[in-house]
């Protein structure tokens, strides 16, 4: 009995450490976006997954013609796979469907940089990034 408990502990501790290691970069990203959002707007009161969801589904029409909204490539349901205009399959953007997503801050910055310009025709604000990321982390 003790050996089974010990074995479970040996398995559970690294798994929890791994999950915590993946969460840290996401928390750091949100903290950085929050600091920037507060600098941009002293009235900033925090991120909202509801605003992030509205942002994800909104059609902007100011970027590329074939990508007027996040949902142009990423599915309306963030837990489902998406598809680029060229037909390439994109992994789901919801954390629950892609657990390792958003663990690499450089990739997150790269994709926000590219996708915001293509959809909005400009860089996303820190609040937009934090709201959208909060929505994806809640899914």
Annotated model-derived regions:
Residues 12, 18-20:
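N-terminal signal peptide c-region/cleavage motif recognized by signal peptidases
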Residues 25-63:
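Electrostatic cytochrome c docking/interface patches
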Residues 91-106:
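Short microdomains enriched in Cys/His and/or Lys/Arg
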Residues 41-49, 63-67, 101, 105, ...:
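Solvent-exposed, acidic/flexible segments
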Residues 82-89:
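Short cysteine/histidine-rich zinc-coordinating motifs and their immediately flanking basic loops
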Residues 67-77, 132:
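The canonical Cys-X-X-Cys-His
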Residues 109-139:
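C-terminal capping alpha-helices of c-type cytochrome domains
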Residues 1-8:
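Bacterial N-terminal signal peptides that target proteins for export
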């Amino acid at each position: 009995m003790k050996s089974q408990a010990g074995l479970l502990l040996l398995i559970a501790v690294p798994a929890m450490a791994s999950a915590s290691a993946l969460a840290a970069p996401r928390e750091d990203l949100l903290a950085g976006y929050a600091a920037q959002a507060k600098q941009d707007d002293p009235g900033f009161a925090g991120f909202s997954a509801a605003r992030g969801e509205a942002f994800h589904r909104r059609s902007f029409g100011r970027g590329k013609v074939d990508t007027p909204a996040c949902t142009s490539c990423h599915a309306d349901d963030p837990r489902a796979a998406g598809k680029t205009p060229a037909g390439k399959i994109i992994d789901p953007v919801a954390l629950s469907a892609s657990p390792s997503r958003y663990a690499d801050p450089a990739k997150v910055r790269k994709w926000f940089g590219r996708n915001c310009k293509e959809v909005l025709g400009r860089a996303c604000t820190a609040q937009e990034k934090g709201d959208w990321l909060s929505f994806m982390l809640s899914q």
